[in-house]
């Protein structure tokens, strides 16, 4: 007779293990599970653990050729979500051997690759991941990190200022370069290609790179400060992306840019390695993130995408504003901002942090506040984000009634006034408007 019984069996018999003690080397995941009516939460949690690790819908004889106990994911704890009906947080532990070293792509393919279409679930959201230090050490991470960036730019003790060039599509390369020059000349540290500026018929990438580099050097010579423009190297193929990065390096510019979700983690990690080897800073835009993270009960929370970016590599990443035109709750946003910047972050459920995360020596990433912010937000932004951040004003610079350079001046003056007021112990939340008014005289 055959040594196993064929047929369908409940996942929870194998994959729900409440007695399991998690290991320091396990990757831990917190899933928000919404089971279909009639499906018990233990079965739903176990199904997630199974389908994202070793399981399939039936017993197979080849299970006997390996040690499931060594390789299976385990749902080790389930708790109901307060205030929600039929929603649970299922905690799953994955043995480290299930994942390829240094590959965010493989990590996501395993953990979220297949399980989200699962029939037994009405919806599923990955809320957080604990990346064990043993796995963290297989990643290069950000090309340079916060301290090295400050040293390269020679800018300390304040947030950095950026601006996205608008209109984002339709300008010729020459006019685009002119706008870059005006903003940098006015006092900004950086200007930025919009995420969808790649290489279109009205402005090919090489022309844009050349005119922006010229603008950069002219502004640098006139202000005596180091300036940067995020040259978007995102392209249709990895080879083309690399070609653009190489050309940027030849021009001697300090920073380039990539859309990491649309470009993909594999391309992004390659680019991050190139940037470290060649002394380029890497600005990351999160285009497409809301497709994945906006639904409260389905998808992947942005804090997971932020952690993945820190592993894959980037020196800046857009992280919401708390005060502008795009969604983002203050405590939750500050939670993942700390996950980007700090070496060690304690578990804190009020800030959405489900696990203590130790990044060991992985460099930090500067959060970028961008989207519908303007000079009157400056006190709040300075207070919320602190010094290690990039504040980006697109329309908030180029929309200045006197033009781009005065827009840049206004932002720089407002920022320096806020930083000085904070250093003198003034209350930015209460006196913010007054501080800006005084500075603008």
Curated annotation (Swiss-Prot):
Self-association and partners:
Heterohexadecamer of 8 large chains and 8 small chains; disulfide-linked. The disulfide link is formed within the large subunit homodimers.
> What name does UniProt use for this protein?
Ribulose bisphosphate carboxylase large chain
**Xref: PANTHER family:** RIBULOSE BISPHOSPHATE CARBOXYLASE, RIBULOSE BISPHOSPHATE CARBOXYLASE LARGE CHAIN
Which reaction(s) does its UniProt entry say it catalyses? 2 (2R)-3-phosphoglycerate + 2 H(+) = D-ribulose 1,5-bisphosphate + CO2 + H2O; D-ribulose 1,5-bisphosphate + O2 = 2-phosphoglycolate + (2R)-3-phosphoglycerate + 2 H(+)
An additional note in the Swiss-Prot or TrEMBL entry is:
The basic functional RuBisCO is composed of a large chain homodimer in a 'head-to-tail' conformation. In form I RuBisCO this homodimer is arranged in a barrel-like tetramer with the small subunits forming a tetrameric 'cap' on each end of the 'barrel'.
Broad enzyme group:
lyase
State where Mg(2+) binds: 192, 194-195
Gene symbol of the encoding locus: rbcL
Q: Where is this site: Transition state stabilizer?
A: 325
For this protein, what post-translational modification is recorded in UniProt?
The disulfide bond which can form in the large chain dimeric partners within the hexadecamer appears to be associated with oxidative stress and protein turnover.
Q: Which residues carry this modification: N6-carboxylysine?
A: 192
User: Where in the sequence is the active site?
Assistant: 166, 285
The record ties this protein, via NCBIfam families, to: PRK04208.1
- Keywords assigned: Calvin cycle, Carbon dioxide fixation, Chloroplast, Disulfide bond, Lyase, Magnesium, Metal-binding, Methylation, Monooxygenase, Oxidoreductase, Photorespiration, Photosynthesis, Plastid
What does the record's cofactor remark say about binding? Binds 1 Mg(2+) ion per subunit.
């Amino acid at each position: 007779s055959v040594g196993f019984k064929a047929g369908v069996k409940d996942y929870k018999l194998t994959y729900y293990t409440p007695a399991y003690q998690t290991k320091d080397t396990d990757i831990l995941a917190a899933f928000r599970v919404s089971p279909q009516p009639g499906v018990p939460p233990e079965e739903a949690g176990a199904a997630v653990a199974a389908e994202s690790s070793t399981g399939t819908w039936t017993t197979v004889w080849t299970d006997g050729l390996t040690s499931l106990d060594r390789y299976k994911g385990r749902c080790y704890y389930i708790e109901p979500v307060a205030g929600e009906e039929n929603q649970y947080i299922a905690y799953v532990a994955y043995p480290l051997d299930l994942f390829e070293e240094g590959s965010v792509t493989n990590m996501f393919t395993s953990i979220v690759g297949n399980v989200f279409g699962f029939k037994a679930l009405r919806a599923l959201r990955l809320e957080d991941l604990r990346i064990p230090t043993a796995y963290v050490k297989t990643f290069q991470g950000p090309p340079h990190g916060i301290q090295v960036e400050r040293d390269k730019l020679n800018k300390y003790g304040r947030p950095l200022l950026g601006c996205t060039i608008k209109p984002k599509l339709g300008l010729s390369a020459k006019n685009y370069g002119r706008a870059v020059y005006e903003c940098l000349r006015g006092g900004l540290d950086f200007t930025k290609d919009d995420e969808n500026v790649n290489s279109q018929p009205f402005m090919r990438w090489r022309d844009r790179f050349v005119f922006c580099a010229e603008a950069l050097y002219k502004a640098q010579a006139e202000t005596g400060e180091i300036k940067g423009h995020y040259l978007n190297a995102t392209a249709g193929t990895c080879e083309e992306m690399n070609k653009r990065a190489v050309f940027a390096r030849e021009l001697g510019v300090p920073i380039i840019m990539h859309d990491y979700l649309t470009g993909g983690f594999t391309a992004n990690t390659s680019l991050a390695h190139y940037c470290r080897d060649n002394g380029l800073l890497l600005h990351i835009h999160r285009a497409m993130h809301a497709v994945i993270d906006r639904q409260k009960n389905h998808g992947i929370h942005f804090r997971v995408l932020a952690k993945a970016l820190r592993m894959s590599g980037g020196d800046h990443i857009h992280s919401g504003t708390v005060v502008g035109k795009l969604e983002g709750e203050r405590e939750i946003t500050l939670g993942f901002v700390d996950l980007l910047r700090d070496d060690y972050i304690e578990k804190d459920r009020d800030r959405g942090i489900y696990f203590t995360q130790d990044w060991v020596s992985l460099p930090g990433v500067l959060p970028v506040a961008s989207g519908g912010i303007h000079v009157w937000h400056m006190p709040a932004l300075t207070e919320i984000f602190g010094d290690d951040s990039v504040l980006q004003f697109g329309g908030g610079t180029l929309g200045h009634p006197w033009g781009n350079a005065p827009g840049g001046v206004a932002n720089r003056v407002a920022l320096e006034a806020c930083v000085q007021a904070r250093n003198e112990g003034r209350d930015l939340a209460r006196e913010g408007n007054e501080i800006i008014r005084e500075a603008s005289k």
